Each structure stands twice: as C-alpha cells, then as structure tokens.
C-alpha cells in the first residue's frame, strides 16, 4: 500500500483523492469498482473543500443534505469511523549500516535510530524508486515499504521484499541500496495519524468453511 498526502493534515481538496487514484493507476489496478474508506472528520473537511468546485447539482445536493461525498476521483467514498490509526515510534530518521544488500531482502541492517520502528510504519530508502509492474520503468517517487513485526533499532524488517534485480520478473523497485543511504519514515516522530484507504473491489477476499447445517 502507498501513502500520499501529508500525515496529520486534513484532506480538504480533491488533490489527495486524485493522487490516491493515480497510485492505483500506476500499479495497474482496474479503473472500475474502486472504493475509499474515509473517517467522518476527513469526510467533512473534504466536502467543505469541494464546495467551490463545479460539480453536478445532484452531487452537491447529496453532499449538503446527506453529508456524503459519493463518487469522486474514480472511487466511491464510504464513511467509516473505524479507520485504522498509525502510531509512529519516537524516531523516524536513520540509515543503512552495511549488512546484506542483495536483491530480494526483507530486512536491513540500520543505525541512527533511538527507538525501534513500530510495526505498520511506512518508509522509503534513498535511491530506491517505485516502478511500473509491467514495463519496469522507474517512477519519480521512491518505493514505499512497511515495517513488519520484530524490527529493532539495528534491524529493520519490512514488506514487500526489495527486489531490484532487472533479471528477476518480480522486480518491484529500481536502484541499489548502499551503506549510509537515508531511511525516512512517513509522518512525524511519536505522532498518530488516520489512514483513509482507497482500494479496488478485488483487493481483499473473505474465505470461510462450509457452515454446519442443523437438522
């Protein structure tokens, strides 16, 4: 998952939803059946920010009467006050400290951290760029990785794997990590921020066993 916008800053314009949709486009997600889970406060500030824009009259009426955004930026917006909140640890800046730097790694040896990164925090690595999943051409933005369980101040575990070998058909980033490359986390240290989520309908699946039939 990619994060766009500025954590902790109200979503008060269409630019952030458009960037969310653009990231899905860049990763070849289908353009139909997209949905966005958004908390009530973000929903309110976004509706206020859209008030001056030219929109279909029925959409404006729904926003004012129902307080719901409806469809925008190729996505159907749904209010949800159970949106997950990320709590950053007390340090968000560090760097690579040598170690194993081969393609496919899921952990980095690091230094410069005074506190262990929390599971779920998102970070980028200097010089490691996101790529188109089919053409493998590099995008201008850095690849984002998510901290997994077990990270410490010297060992940063993450997902997805950092696959930068051009010969690997599963390559997902461009560039080569190196000693002393900066590691930068999304958001400020010791801060909490909500994470509204835009996704395609088929991003998740619910699987269950057959229910027991009672005679």
Regions found by a protein language model. Name each.
Residues 27-28, 74-75, 104, 178-182, ...:
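Glycine-centered flexibility motif
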């Amino acid at each position: 998952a990619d994060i766009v916008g500025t954590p902790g800053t109200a979503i008060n314009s269409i630019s952030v939803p458009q960037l969310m949709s653009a990231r899905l486009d860049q990763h070849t997600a289908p353009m139909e059946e997209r949905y966005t889970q958004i908390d009530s406060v973000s929903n309110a500030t976004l509706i206020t920010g859209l008030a001056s824009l030219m929109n279909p009259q029925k959409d404006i009426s729904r926003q004012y009467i129902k307080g719901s955004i409806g469809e925008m930026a190729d996505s159907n917006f749904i209010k949800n006050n159970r949106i997950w909140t990320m709590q950053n640890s007390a340090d968000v800046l560090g760097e690579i400290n040598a170690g194993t730097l081969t393609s496919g790694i899921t952990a980095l040896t690091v230094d410069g951290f005074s506190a262990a990164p929390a599971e779920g925090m998102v970070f980028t690595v200097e010089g490691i760029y996101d790529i188109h999943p089919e053409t493998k051409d590099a995008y201008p933005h850095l690849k984002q990785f998510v901290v997994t369980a077990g990270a410490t101040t010297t060992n940063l575990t993450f997902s997805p794997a950092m696959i930068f070998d051009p010969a690997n058909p599963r390559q997902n980033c461009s560039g080569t990590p190196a000693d002393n490359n900066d590691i930068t986390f999304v958001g400020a240290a010791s801060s909490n921020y909500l994470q509204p989520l835009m996704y395609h309908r088929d991003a998740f699946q619910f699987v269950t066993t057959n229910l027991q039939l009672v005679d």
